[in-house]
Amino acid sequence: MRIIFAGTPEPAVVALQKLIESHHEVAAVITRPDARRGRGRSLHPSPVKALAEEHGIEVLTPTTLKQGTEDGDALRARLAEIAPEAIPVVAYGNLITEDLLSLPKHGWVNLHFSLLPTWRGAAPVQAAIAAGDERTGATTFRIDQGLDTGDILATMEETIRPTDTADDLLTRLAYAGGDLLVETMNGLEDGSIIPQPQEGEATYAHKIATEDARIDWTAKVDVIDRHIRAHTPGPGAWTLLGESRLKVGPVSVVEPAELGELSDTTALTSLQPGEVHVAKKEVMVGTGSTPVRLGQIQPPGKKMMNAADWGRGLSSQASQAAEGGQVEVKFS
């Protein structure tokens, strides 16, 4: 089946590669225009464009899909020439206008990383981890004018592991979802797939802003653990130390039974939310329930570092500033 692929970021590359390796003909890709990145602000192609060019596939990079614009009209003309039977979509990042949806025989088919109608929207993987869901998955559906509301074509399930970060889970879903997308194209081609309307209560995963990633240390420890993993690696869970913003990597929960085995049990059980306790080989932070043990932390202008090394730096500063070297630090 002749298809055009629409996608932009790294997770979309996996699906494109699997489609290229299938018997389907990827006649072209649609992706976002080159973007400026890095300190030099030089132009870089999207990951999807880079892969397409490696395989000699035509690349279309319209700034808009709106009819009546130069880019939008040029895209429509090219689509008419290529005449794809379906346009699979993975994280393309541009609004698909209503008149375009009916152009391919089988429509525009989106790969969404949740079990719809659960977690419609921009950040379904992060939302599933933060909510404490035990399972999620991927869904292929025919795009309509709603927000992830189209008829379902196929689904697959994936277990969320207790230590999964958003990156861990998204990586697994990208590979399994890529296979699902190929299977969906196969089913549309041979007529074995019958679109089904979405059923059940919808939930929504809004686009994540930097402020959303801030850690609330008054929350219970399991909520904080999930919040940090959900925002790792991007945009990165963060907290304030004075006026400095620090990114915090995944933490480990200090279980109540474990407290009795630690040398500073009294100090740890009395930690207030956000209060930091520096020991010889670890850094603990108080929460709304039991403490957490920091794994990695990123001070401003530096790379991620071992939290124990960061804690020793704090101890050194304290010993220079006050007799006895007592470390009194609190995140906010």
Swiss-Prot record:
GO molecular function, one term: methionyl-tRNA formyltransferase activity
Domain of life: Bacteria
The keyword Magnesium appears for this protein: no
GO CC entries: cytosol
Enzyme class name: transferase
Keyword line: Protein biosynthesis, Transferase
Family note: Belongs to the Fmt family.
Stated name of the protein: Methionyl-tRNA formyltransferase
Gene that produces this protein: fmt
